[in-house]
Amino acid sequence: MAFIYRCQIELHDSLYFATREIGRLYETEPVIHNYALCYALGLVDSEIYSTTVSEEHSYRYFCPEQVPKYEPHLTALNPQGIYVTPGRSISHSSTLNTWKYANNNYHVEMEKTQKNIPSFGRTKEISPESKFEFFIISQKSLKLAKWIRLGKWMSKAAVEIVEQKELKRSPSETNFIFPYLLNPLDVMFSHLVISYDVVNMPPVSLIQNVKMLGRYYEFDKLKIPACMAYRFRAD
């Protein structure tokens, strides 16, 4: 048996992260990566969810650097049977903003820079009141935060569990189509992926309208792939 949560996120601030860069335009795709959701929901390196990692890879408020280390951080969720799918847009709109970065130093030595830091540009952001939907699959009951922060600007968003069910996975493998977003690395080792559409975005491109062979959970009329886990290598 697994607990399946259908969750929705409503933005209360503009959401920005650079899905793609077109010249000086930095565009935010109306998609929330499942890696980002794990961090935003507080599932990573958490005593509450029993996903703590070694001190070397610590990802808490007081740590040497708050840099995501996806493999040690996310694979810690696998023993607890916690998996989050990417978030798809239910309704959204976008806004364009122009920004400029200025250096106000009185004295500047003209040295070759080691980092490519843009000085101006435009951002295409997801507007407030936009809504996203995702699923959480867990082997035990979870209590989620009602408010989270997302994106480069740490935008405020409300989380709501719209529906939850306790389900058994299908007894046998069968062909089915999952129309929403999936992380291919997390599903390809437990299912035979036959066809899909690609959504290009870092750090791992996502897929949707996926036809596959494998086991699933039947949530209302939707078949959600079972046995998904965070994978980063073919061991």
Give names to the regions the model predicted.
Residues 11-15, 138-140:
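Beta-strand elements of well-folded, non-transmembrane domains
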